[in-house]
């Protein structure tokens, strides 16, 4: 009888550890992957909008003319701006650094950056799939342990 009670407590302890691993580790890892993926998708959107704006500037052919535009100062607060030479553009490349590009150089940079960001999103998608597979595996283990636990109760206490 004591041996059966010990086995029951061992199973309950294993169930608790599996549930803890599922909640504390796998679920948080999956949440972090989704958050990173969302941040990268936001960057992709920004670079795509920038690419579209540069292409529009190239189409209008503003050689020798000022470009008038609205600039977002933050929190969707805009002001009017006048750009005396719209043939060059500064792009934030990370870590607080800006690089001056010609419009064609900027488009080339953006294409490479978009490819890199898309690769990162794809990798994070694969990471999320792996974490989900691990979660499924742990859930299967939990179901098996709980099934064994219920089976042992049925064996000792017939209905």
Curated annotation (Swiss-Prot):
- Cross-referenced Pfam families: Prefoldin
Superkingdom is Eukaryota
Q: Name its GO BP terms in alphabetical order.
A: negative regulation of transcription by RNA polymerase II
Q: Which InterPro entries does the record associate with it?
A: Prefoldin (IPR009053), Prefoldin_subunit_alpha (IPR004127), UXT (IPR003994)
Which GO molecular-function terms appear in the entry?
A: transcription corepressor activity
Q: Which GO CC annotations does the UniProt entry carry?
A: chromatin; mediator complex
Taken from the UniProt record, the cysteine pairs bridged by disulfide bonds within this chain are none
Q: Which NCBIfam families match?
A: prefoldin subunit alpha
Q: Which family does it belong to?
A: Belongs to the UXT family.
Q: What is the protein's name according to its record?
A: Protein UXT homolog
């Amino acid at each position: 009888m004591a041996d059966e009670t010990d086995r029951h407590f061992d199973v309950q302890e294993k169930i608790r550890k599996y549930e803890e691993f599922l909640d504390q580790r796998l679920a948080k890892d999956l949440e972090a992957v989704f958050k990173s993926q969302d941040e990268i998708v936001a960057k992709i959107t920004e670079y795509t909008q920038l690419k579209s704006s540069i292409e529009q500037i190239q189409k209008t052919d503003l050689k020798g003319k000022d470009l008038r535009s609205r600039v977002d100062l933050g929190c969707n607060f805009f002001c009017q701006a006048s750009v005396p030479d719209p043939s060059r553009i500064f792009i934030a490349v990370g870590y607080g650094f800006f690089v001056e590009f010609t419009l064609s150089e900027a488009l080339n940079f953006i294409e490479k950056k978009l490819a890199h960001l898309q690769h990162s999103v794809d990798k994070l998608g694969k990471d999320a799939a792996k974490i989900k597979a691990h979660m499924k595996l742990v859930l299967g283990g939990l179901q098996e342990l709980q099934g064994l636990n219920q089976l042992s109760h049925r064996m000792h206490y017939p209905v």
